[in-house]
C-alpha cells in the first residue's frame, strides 16, 4: 500500500468506487481484475530508488557538513539543518513502506508500522513547512529590521523555535496514529490482503481535517512567506538603487573636483569635506587622505560583497519554498478534493495522475540538498571538505559567503536602505 496514499485515500466508499470502475494505482480495486502493465513496476522501482538514494545521500551530507563545520552553524543554517532532518525522516520511514506494499499489493508490516509511517510522514511535512516559515521571518528580520531583530536573532532562540515546531508538529499529527488502521480486502486469488488507511469516523470530520491541513500547512504559510520575501526583495532593490545613486554622485563629485578644484560641500557619507589648504597642509594630509580613500574603497567593496551574499541566500531560500509547495500542494489539494467530492476526485485523479502526484510529493525530500549544492558556494566547499579524498578547497567558513555570519552586526544593517549609507561609514568592516 502506498503510505502517502493513506493521506489521499481515507478508506471510505471503496466498494462503490470499484463498482463505478474507478480503478487506479492506489489499491481502490485490488479485488477487481485489470490489465497488467509489466513496465510499471520497473519504472516505479527505478524512480523510487533514485529519489531515495538522492534524498539519503544529500540530506545526510547536509547534516554532516553543518555539524562538522562550526562556522557554518548560523541562524539560517540551523533551520536548514532541521529541514534536512525532517526530509531524511520522510525518506527513511515512509518511502520503503510505500514502495514495497505497492509492489506486493499488500501491506505486510502490520498495524503498528501503518500508524508510525503515517504519523512520521505528516510530522515531517509539518516540520518542513514551519521551518520554511521561520526561515522567511528570520531573513526578513535580518535584512529589513536589522536593529530590532538583534535581540532574538540568536542561535539559542533558533533552537527554541525549532524545538517548538517539532513539538507542535507531533501534536497536530496525532490523529494519524489514532485513526490509521489496516483495512482487509480480498485479492484476485481469494486471499486476504491489507491496506493501510487513514479512517476518520465520518465525512464531516474528514472534510474538516483536510481543510485544516490545507490552511495551516500551505495557504497561511504560503501567504506569510510570499509577503516576507516580497518585502525582502523590495528592500534589496532599494538598497541596490540607493548604492547606485551614491556611487554615481561620488563619481560626479570626483570628476568635478578634478576639473574645478576642491569642493566646499559634501553629503557626509562617502566624501570628506575639503578646503583650500596651504601647500604645506596639503603635503602633510596627503597620506591621510590616501588612507581614507582606501578605507572607503574597502567599505564599498565589503558592502557590495555582503549585498551579493544576501541576494544569493534569498534566491536559494525562495527556490526551496517554491519547490516545496510544488511538490506538496498537489497531494493536499487532492486530499481536500476527495474529502468534498470523492467520486469526482477518483474519476479525474485515478491512474497516472495520482501516481505522479504521489511520486512528486516524495521528490521534495531530495531537492533541498541539490539546491544547497548548486546555489551556495559555502555548501559546495563544505561538501568537498567532507570527503578526505577531495582536494581541500579552503575553509568553508569564509565570511560573507552565506551572508548570515555577520548577522546583528554591520552586514545585516547595511542592507537597509537608510542604514546602508550610514552604517557603511560608521566603522571599518570587522
Swiss-Prot record:
GO terms for molecular function: cholecystokinin receptor activity; neuropeptide receptor activity; peptide hormone binding. InterPro entries: Cholcskin_rcpt (IPR009126), Cholcy_rcpt_A (IPR000596), CholecystokininA_recpt_N (IPR015276), CholecystokininA_recpt_N_sf (IPR036472), GPCR_Rhodpsn (IPR000276), GPCR_Rhodpsn_7TM (IPR017452). Residues 1-41, 105-115, 179-210, 337-351 are extracellular. Residues 413-430 have a biased composition (Polar residues). It is a multi-pass membrane protein. Belongs to the G-protein coupled receptor 1 family. This is Cholecystokinin receptor type A. It comes from Cavia porcellus (Guinea pig). The lineage of its organism: Eukaryota, Metazoa, Chordata, Craniata, Vertebrata. The gene is CCKAR.
